[in-house]
Amino acid sequence: MYKSPLTLLTLLTICFGFFDLSSALYGSSSPVVQLTASNFKSKVLNSNGVVLVEFFAPWCGHCKALTPTWEKVANILKGVATVAAIDADAHQSAAQDYGIKGFPTIKVFVPGKAPIDYQGARDAKSIANFAYKQIKGLLSDRLEGKSKPTGGGSKEKKSEPSASVELNASNFDDLVIESNELWIVEFFAPWCGHCKKLAPEWKRAAKNLQGKVKLGHVNCDVEQSIMSRFKVQGFPTILVFGPDKSSPYPYEGARSASAIESFASELVESSAGPVEVTELTGPDVMEKKCGSAAICFISFLPDILDSKAEGRNKYLEMLLSVAEKFKKQPYSFMWVAAVTQMDLEKRVNVGGYGYPAMVAMNVKKGVYAPLKSAFELQHLLEFVKDAGTGGKGNVPMNGTPEIVKTKEWDGKDGELIEEDEFSLDELMGGDDAVGSKDEL
């Protein structure tokens, strides 16, 4: 069958045009920086400034629609921030490192922090405004001395802690997750100034804690899958892997060898001692039990006239069971009788839905999370476990609660205070008095 040369030429043009479009969305003259798996580290991770990265697929319709907008953003931010793009089809390893599931995905890389997902509107103004906020935050951190330029280029740590175990994707589960030992793990980035400052302290702590507590470190530039797995958001992050290895919690103490050693030693000692649920009887008790605890769990128990001693003791036995389950975690458990600490109840919104109730508090951060299910053993265990992973949603306390001094419970049933009866006539002065007043 005869085919017109023009028709064949048209078909070839369409085919080759299609393959050309599928190879890339941004040409050599585009203001958007072209990324590959080989230059990603130098262009993005080692950058001293904010970098916006679009992960795209050439066949993706939404990616094609975003192309002119992304180039407009690149022109707007020229000289202020880097706007880049990477073909996730051609460079799948880079996409896998950041858990890319759909296209286009936009991530913003800020020095010293984990990448941030951009989930706003896909117009140039919205994207540029979001970038501006990140740039402003970076400048603010540098002015306050929290972040410093890296000088361009990622450098490996000159001296790895000799007693700290180097952890990676191939050995992390075997050494940490499957272990019965306590592990304290530092997640760092080689270019991070705060990480470099911590390095000698970490080395000293690891050496002094040998045989007592395991210390390890993860290079997040290399082991990004581990970083994502434990939701590491900044560097350095120190996580404590206690008995429940699936729910590590952050170390929030000072970044000195002595502080880390003291924390680890106290953790080991507390795991061996008896558990306790302390009655909150004043500000000194609050400071002692909640001041240094990662999470402070406070239970608000019914008035003794409502539960009697037998009922209250049952609640306390239940709380002791919960405390025993989490004895190796840096938690504290306290209880307080209903309406004895009114300012605390007000700030954590307890009382309106009855007693008993429980809240998880982080005093340092000034936040809390309420127990929303029944005050029963299984629900309490689940609540404490979830609170340890940040899965309960924190609510601000809006200020430090005022704790008042109260008497410690004597372990007995309460006594109903009977009030003296009075006569309405006596209150009003009696009939004679009323009559006399009327006569006047």
Curated annotation (Swiss-Prot):
Residues 143-163 are annotated as: Disordered. A motif (Prevents secretion from ER) lies at residues 437-440. It holds the Pfam family Thioredox_PDIA6_C. It catalyses: Catalyzes the rearrangement of -S-S- bonds in proteins. Disulfide bonds join 60-63, 192-195. Residues 25-136, 154-269 form the Thioredoxin domain. GO terms for cellular component: endoplasmic reticulum; endoplasmic reticulum lumen; Golgi apparatus; plant-type vacuole. The active site is at residues 60, 63, 192, 195. Glycans are attached at residue 168. It is found in: Endoplasmic reticulum lumen. Residues 1-24 form the signal peptide. Widely expressed. This is Protein disulfide-isomerase 2-3. It comes from Arabidopsis thaliana (Mouse-ear cress).
